[in-house]
Amino acid sequence: MADMKRLKHLMFSPFIDNNPIALQVLGICSALAVTTKLQTAIVMGISVALVTGFSSFFISLVRNYIPNSIRIIVQMAIIASLVTLVDQLLQAFAYELSKQLSVFVGLIITNCIVMGRAEAFAMKEPPLESLIDGIGNGAGYGMMLLVVATVRELIGSGKLLGYTVFQTVQDGGWYQTNGLFLLAPSAFFIIGFLIWGLRTWKPEQAEE
C-alpha cells in the first residue's frame, strides 16, 4: 500500500514547492491564451489535471511492456486519446466554453507538463503514485491559471465569472477598465510577479 505521507507530498508539493509554472516554467503558452476569463481557466485547469493524472496512470500500468525505442509514441497515443475524450465531452456538454478554449484543449497533447510527468515519473513509479502525481501537477498548473485569470478578468473588465464586481464607468460606476490586462502580454507580467514573489518567499527556489 502506498505511503500516505508520500501521496500527500505528491499531491500538494506542485502547488507551491514545485509548481510547474512558477518553478519549472512549463505550460506558459496556454497560460497566456486561456486566462482572459476565470471560467475558461477553471475548465482548462481541470482538463489538464485529469489528462495528466490519467495519462500518467495508464502509462505507469503498461510501462514494463513498452519497448524503450517507442515509449514516446506510446505516451503520445495515450495522452492524445485522453485529450480527444476531454475535447469531445466539452463539445457535447459545454459547447460555448469549448469554442472559447478553441485549439488549446487539443494542444494539451503537447503540454510539457503532461509529457514531463509521463517521462520523468510515470515510467518509473507505480500507477497510484503516478495518478496522484499527475493530478497534483495538473492542479498546481490550474492554480496558477486561476490566479492569473482572476487578476486579468477583474482588472481588465471589472467582472469575475461574468458577474460584475466593479461597476464600470461605462455603466455609470467608478471603475475604469484596463484593456492591457485582456491582452496576452499582461499574463507575462503577472506570471513574472508571481514567480518573483514565490522565490522571494522561498529563496531556495531561486536559480543560481
From Swiss-Prot:
Look up keyword NAD and say if it applies. yes
* Top EC category: translocase
Biological process GO annotation list? sodium ion transport
Origin, by domain of life?
Answer: Bacteria
Listed transmembrane segments: 42-62, 72-92, 103-123, 131-151, 178-198
Topology relative to the lipid bilayer, per the entry, is: Multi-pass membrane protein
Give a yes or no for keyword Flavoprotein in this entry: no
Q: What does it do?
A: NQR complex catalyzes the reduction of ubiquinone-1 to ubiquinol by two successive reactions, coupled with the transport of Na(+) ions from the cytoplasm to the periplasm. NqrA to NqrE are probably involved in the second step, the conversion of ubisemiquinone to ubiquinol.
Instruction: Output the HAMAP family linked to this UniProt entry.
Output: NqrD (MF_00428)
Protein name according to UniProt: Na(+)-translocating NADH-quinone reductase subunit D
Source organism of this protein record: Neisseria gonorrhoeae (strain ATCC 700825 / FA 1090)
